A protein has these predicted regions:
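Short, hydrophobic/amphipathic alpha-helical packing segments
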Residues: 29, 185-192, 228, 232
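Short glycine/threonine-rich loop-to-helix capping motif typified by GTGT followed
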Residues: 177-183, 215-228, 254-265, 326-329
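Glycine-rich beta-strand-to-loop/alpha-helix junction loops that act as flexible
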Residues: 171-173, 206-215, 248-251
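Charged (often Lys/Glu-rich) extended helix/loop segments that serve as interaction or gating elements
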Residues: 243-390
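Active-site-proximal beta-alpha core segment in soluble small-molecule metabolic enzymes
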Residues: 37, 41-205
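Acidic/histidine-enriched ion/cofactor-binding microenvironments in catalytic or ligand-binding pockets
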Residues: 201-203, 225-239, 325-340
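N-terminal capping/small domains of soluble enzymes
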Residues: 1-93, 329-342, 346-348, 354
Length: 390
């Protein structure tokens, strides 16, 4: 973010708020595309940040949609529903029926269990509608299915309405081991080849969530580009013959986000300087932060000449856990100053404990050089959600 460019604009809005810069979003997608090449598809996991899906529609190939709520957001945004992959560990019969009734065979569905397969079988047969599915291979948790069950489904796959497109696999986020990526892709490549060798089943699509890392903290070594390029090389070595689609959320969205909060109080307790801001940990989420010890990149807006001093930045929640960062050096920090936390484009706006203490939800702004600022969501009161609806 160019601090000077936004210096005036951000003072027009009441803190706390988020800014999602869609120019930065587009740059990140272009960087990913440039490394991977034209043959690899991009699937955006919208749980990372649903507010930017319309801005991504023309630059990604598909959207991973994991709940009825996310599905409704896609409809409201006017997303091409042919780009939707209906995922999620829990699928209800009525949700599948709705999707089939309204969108026919446009959507791809993931199969996470035998009951998912049975639900999709029942719905497609009832509605006489062909559907396409991906079978999710488990990585050793509650998601997906064992290899043996996938083999069983593939072996008996003859079905009038269900077409198995391929395999889906995801094992975690913030991976910093090239070897782990290589081993996972080698395992998947071998599994896909075995499905063809053993059952004559060609895997047309492999959807893989690489979990590439975002460098959030100043003291971390930035390995984003190294991991991306290593992933691209590993994909080129695959031999199963189908299309590879990379499911990404954090790696696409994180760089575009900024969380802006204001200093509302300052004090010194037992020799430590505390700065209270009007936001808090319920609105800010950095994966890997440990007891506020790690230092994210923070811009101090309108900082002035004066003494540099370490401040522990705390939010407005009535809990000792509401510490955003400890002993961060600011120059002449004063009440009313605005602090901009960077790389908050993924999960901060959606994953925080936003209803705690009935604090208002922050405003969300979408920015681009072409359109300037757009309000995607105003400040919203949460107290109405935390008591009986009268």
């Amino acid at each position: 973010m160019n601090e000077k460019k936004f210096e005036y604009d951000i003072h027009e809005y009441q803190t706390p708020f988020y800014i999602f810069d869609t120019d930065i979003l587009a740059e990140q997608v272009n960087k990913i595309r440039g490394a991977l090449g034209e043959d690899v598809e991009l699937c955006y996991a919208m749980k990372a940040n649903p507010f930017v899906i319309k801005d991504l529609e023309e630059v990604v190939d598909s959207f991973e949609v994991c709940s009825p709520g996310e599905f409704a957001i896609c409809e409201r945004a006017g997303i091409n529903m042919g780009k939707v992959i209906m995922s999620g560990v829990h699928k209800k019969l009525e949700d599948v029926e709705y999707a089939l009734n309204h969108y026919g065979d446009k959507i791809i569905y993931t199969v996470e269990s035998l009951s998912h397969w049975q639900i999709l079988d029942a719905c497609s047969t009832l509605l006489q509608t062909p559907i396409r599915v991906l079978l999710r291979l488990t990585s050793g948790n509650q998601f997906g299915m064992d290899e043996s069950l996938i083999r069983q489904i593939v072996e008996g796959r003859a079905h009038e309405f269900i077409t198995i497109e391929g395999i889906q696999y995801f094992s975690g986020t913030q991976k910093k081991s090239i070897t782990k990526l290589e081993n996972e892709l080698h395992m998947l490549d071998q599994f896909c080849r075995e499905l063809y060798q053993d059952y004559g089943f060609p895997v047309k699509r492999l959807e893989y969530g690489p979990g590439l890392p975002i460098c959030y903290f100043e003291e971390e070594k930035n390995e984003e580009e190294l991991m991306l390029n290593s992933l691209a090389l590993s994909i080129k070595n695959l031999t199963f013959g189908g299309t590879v689609a990379l499911e990404m959320g954090r790696f696409i969205a994180a760089p575009c986000g900024f969380y802006v909060t204001s200093v509302v109080d300052q004090k010194t307790n037992k020799g430590e300087s505390y700065c209270i801001v009007d936001g808090g940990i319920h609105q800010l989420n950095y994966y890997g932060q440990m007891l506020a010890m790690k230092k994210p990149n923070i811009l101090h807006v309108n900082h002035r000449e004066g003494e540099q001093k370490e401040w522990t930045v705390c939010g407005s929640l009535c809990t000792v856990n509401d510490v955003l960062v400890k002993k961060y050096p600011f120059q002449n920090l004063q009440g009313g100053d605005r602090l901009i936390f960077q790389k908050t484009g993924a999960y901060s706006a959606t994953e925080g404990m936003s209803l705690f203490l009935s604090r208002d939800l922050p405003q969300i702004l979408i920015y681009s050089a072409k359109d300037g600022f757009r309000i995607a969501r105003p400040h919203l009161q949460t107290n109405v959600l935390n008591y009986f609806q009268l």
